[in-house]
């Protein structure tokens, strides 16, 4: 990911304030609500029948936290995203057969959730930096598909 030193510092400073459980649960929940076809990868999660069920589902929240924790690993290793996400890329490609477009969708949903949580602190400049980061993470996760 091509970020200036200032952009990296801003991304890391915001990330240090992120509540992984809260933001992760909301981001994954929103992905499943906004793009309902993504629910097919989460058959074992129980009731995903409506937005309230999805957003209140403890398995969605728990997996969202796990996803966001992994994303945070990427934030701290921006110069080696492919290496950081190599195993997850392999898992999602070879075993789970997740459409790599879903990584881009989740990244965009995450940016929306960050904006919601951080309000005016999530400036257009910071959004631009995070868009670069989520695109880089999505590309790293899609790496094994090529």
UniProtKB/Swiss-Prot annotation:
The keyword RNA-binding does not apply. Residues 2-146 form the Globin domain. Heme b binds at residues 63, 92. GO terms for molecular function: haptoglobin binding; heme binding; hemoglobin alpha binding; metal ion binding; organic acid binding; oxygen binding; oxygen carrier activity; peroxidase activity. Keywords: Acetylation, Heme, Iron, Metal-binding, Oxygen transport, Phosphoprotein, S-nitrosylation, Transport. The modification N-acetylvaline is found at residue 1. Red blood cells. The modification S-nitrosocysteine is found at residue 93. GO terms for biological process: hydrogen peroxide catabolic process. Involved in oxygen transport from the lung to the various peripheral tissues. This is Hemoglobin subunit beta. The gene is HBB.
């Amino acid at each position: 990911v091509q970020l200036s030193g200032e952009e990296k510092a801003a991304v890391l400073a915001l990330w240090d304030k992120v509540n992984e459980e809260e933001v992760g649960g909301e981001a994954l929940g929103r992905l499943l609500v906004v793009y309902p076809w993504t629910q097919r990868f989460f058959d074992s999660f129980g009731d995903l029948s409506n937005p309230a069920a999805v957003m209140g589902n403890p398995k969605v929240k728990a997996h969202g936290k796990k996803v966001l924790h992994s994303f945070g690993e990427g934030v701290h290793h921006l110069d080696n995203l492919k290496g950081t996400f190599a195993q997850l890329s392999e898992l999602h490609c070879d075993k789970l057969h997740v459409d790599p477009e879903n990584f881009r969708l989740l990244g965009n949903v995450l940016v929306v959730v960050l904006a919601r949580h951080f309000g005016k602190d999530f400036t257009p400049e910071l959004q631009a930096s995070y868009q670069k980061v989520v695109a880089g993470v999505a590309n790293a996760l899609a790496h094994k598909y090529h």
